[in-house]
From Swiss-Prot:
GO terms for cellular component: cytoplasm. Its EC number is 3.6.1.31. Keywords: Amino-acid biosynthesis, ATP-binding, Cytoplasm, Histidine biosynthesis, Hydrolase, Nucleotide-binding. It is an enzyme of class 3 (hydrolase). It catalyses: 1-(5-phospho-beta-D-ribosyl)-ATP + H2O = 1-(5-phospho-beta-D-ribosyl)-5'-AMP + diphosphate + H(+). It is found in: Cytoplasm. Belongs to the PRA-PH family. It holds the Pfam family PRA-PH. This is Phosphoribosyl-ATP pyrophosphatase. Gene3D superfamilies: MazG-like. Pathway: Amino-acid biosynthesis; L-histidine biosynthesis; L-histidine from 5-phospho-alpha-D-ribose 1-diphosphate: step 2/9. SUPFAM superfamilies: all-alpha NTP pyrophosphatases. GO terms for biological process: L-histidine biosynthetic process.
Amino acid sequence: MTQSPNVKTFDALFAELSERARTRPAGSGTVAALDGGVHGIGKKILEEAGEVWLAAEHESDEALAEEISQLLYWTQVLMLSRGLSLDDVYGKL
């Protein structure tokens, strides 16, 4: 699979989010979400999962891909908030 240079992989996104969590740049939505804790992040995951389902039922493939990307983002933020690594998850696949 060839990708444009602007396309992120799951691993690259996790590395980027890990760096934000470590460096805590001002104004970062990721940092704000991490500071808000697991409860708030979990609510976002439920919201995004519902939007994925609705997009699958009623929207275009492009809209569905966008919703899935948001669900993956929030899932990774939750992983970071709990201290999980990609290997922790990959080991369960």
